[in-house]
């Protein structure tokens, strides 16, 4: 039996959503399933099943996305459901001149230099040693970016997980604890043999990782931001283990909900670098704004941001249930949105393989995502949310 989803299609920010809890297994049976190496996944609202790890990867190879909610099952009640936070987003851009001046400092060369190194790790698979080493290197780059700015109160922290690769959170404090979040996932995967084969992950999601880091670097050039004059706090997140069922982002937002964090928005940047699918199909270059399982108010404001700050337009597209880390934010009641490189059917088909390399990317296109990210973060940092 299926029940209404926590992430109802096209939900408005003002809508309160309640999802029913499916039939529960006895806790002893759950412990036994975990002991046998099984994982509880949620493929859609109310659609849960226990699977082996190989079955998880088989579903991913078939294009299915899901939450891995095994940790919730271990607590005896799943899935957890939360009412959506109500947020009124701006109706117009308020900082165009300042944002455009900042955006002129965004660098394609920096994006390419970063990705050349980031994709040189054998794999960024979340349980691998090279996946942990890539996270350490990424943390150092973020730390250096903050140190080279005048933001004395900004900080970067590791969010540890039971597996090897940690998530990373960079924070720029504002005048309140109201928080604007931008995220990407740092892990990669080769779905043929995840723990053995290389996975450069240039587009998925090295591109998003680089995009938001470059946006952070340029945002820190704003004295108003670095001096803590923005009304709202800004965070940049790099999640671990997205490919395994949004594990890292679920852990982060579960902790935020437990701590009563006041997250006003979350934008995910996952796959920001591939444009050939669009242009080879005879269409003008554009970014893809996801419209399913997202916050309607935030998504509508992002349309204005793209129009105001990017040199290309947008198309509306869908990606399905639990298709990236923004879904974890929504799962815990926080307004979220997702912008991808193109209409979903034109996105890169090279991902999850050895062929997802830097040579396939369009850095001019990535720069447009960086402009959008910078514009959104700056506008919302200074908005009355």
From Swiss-Prot:
Protein name as annotated: Leucine aminopeptidase 1
InterPro entries (alphabetical): M28_fam, Peptidase_M28
EC number from the UniProt entry: 3.4.11.-
Cofactor dependence: Zn(2+)
Highest taxon of source: Eukaryota
Enzyme class: hydrolase
Taxonomic placement: Eukaryota, Fungi, Dikarya, Ascomycota, Pezizomycotina
Binding site for Zn(2+) 1: 185, 204, 270
GO cellular component: extracellular region
Propeptide: 21-87
Intrachain disulfide bonds: 319-323
Subcellular location: Secreted
Signal peptide positions on this chain: 1-20
């Amino acid at each position: 039996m299926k029940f209404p989803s926590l992430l109802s299609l096209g939900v408005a920010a003002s809508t309160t959503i309640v999802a029913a809890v499916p039939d529960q297994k006895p806790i002893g049976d759950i412990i036994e399933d975990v002991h046998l190496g099984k994982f509880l996944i949620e493929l859609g609202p109310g659609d849960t099943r226990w699977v082996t790890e190989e079955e998880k990867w088989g579903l991913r190879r078939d294009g299915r996305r899901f939450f891995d909610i095994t940790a919730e099952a271990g607590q005896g009640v799943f899935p957890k459901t939360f009412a959506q936070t109500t947020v009124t987003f701006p109706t117009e851009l308020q900082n165009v001149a300042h944002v455009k001046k900042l955006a002129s400092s965004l660098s394609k060369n920096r994006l390419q230099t970063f990705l050349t190194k980031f994709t040189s790790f054998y794999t960024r698979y979340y349980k691998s040693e090279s996946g942990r080493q890539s996270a350490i290197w990424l943390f150092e780059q973020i730390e250096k970016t903050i140190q080279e700015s005048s933001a004395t109160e900004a900080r970067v922290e590791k969010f540890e997980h039971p597996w090897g690769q940690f998530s990373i959170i960079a924070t720029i404090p504002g005048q309140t604890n109201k928080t604007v979040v931008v995220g990407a996932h740092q892990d990669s995967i080769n779905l043929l043999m995840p723990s053995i084969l290389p996975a450069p992950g240039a587009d998925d999601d090295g591109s998003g990782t680089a995009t938001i880091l470059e946006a952070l670097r340029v945002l820190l050039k704003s004295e108003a931001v670095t001096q803590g004059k923005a009304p709202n706090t800004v965070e940049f997140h790099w999640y671990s283990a997205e490919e395994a069922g949004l594990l890292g982002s679920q852990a982060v937002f579960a902790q935020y909900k437990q701590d009563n964090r006041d997250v006003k928005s979350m934008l995910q940047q996952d796959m920001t670098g591939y444009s050939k699918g669009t242009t080879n199909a005879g269409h003008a270059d554009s970014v893809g704004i996801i419209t399913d399982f997202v916050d309607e108010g935030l998504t509508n404001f992002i349309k204005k941001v793209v129009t105001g700050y990017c040199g290309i337009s947008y198309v509306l597209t869908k990606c399905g249930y639990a298709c990236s880390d923004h879904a974890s934010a929504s799962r815990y009641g926080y307004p979220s949105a997702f912008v991808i490189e193109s209409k979903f059917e034109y996105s890169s088909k090279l991902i999850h393989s050895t062929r997802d390399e830097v040579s396939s990317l369009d850095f001019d296109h990535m720069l447009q995502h960086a402009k959008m990210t910078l514009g959104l973060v700056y506008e919302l940092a200074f908005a009355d949310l």
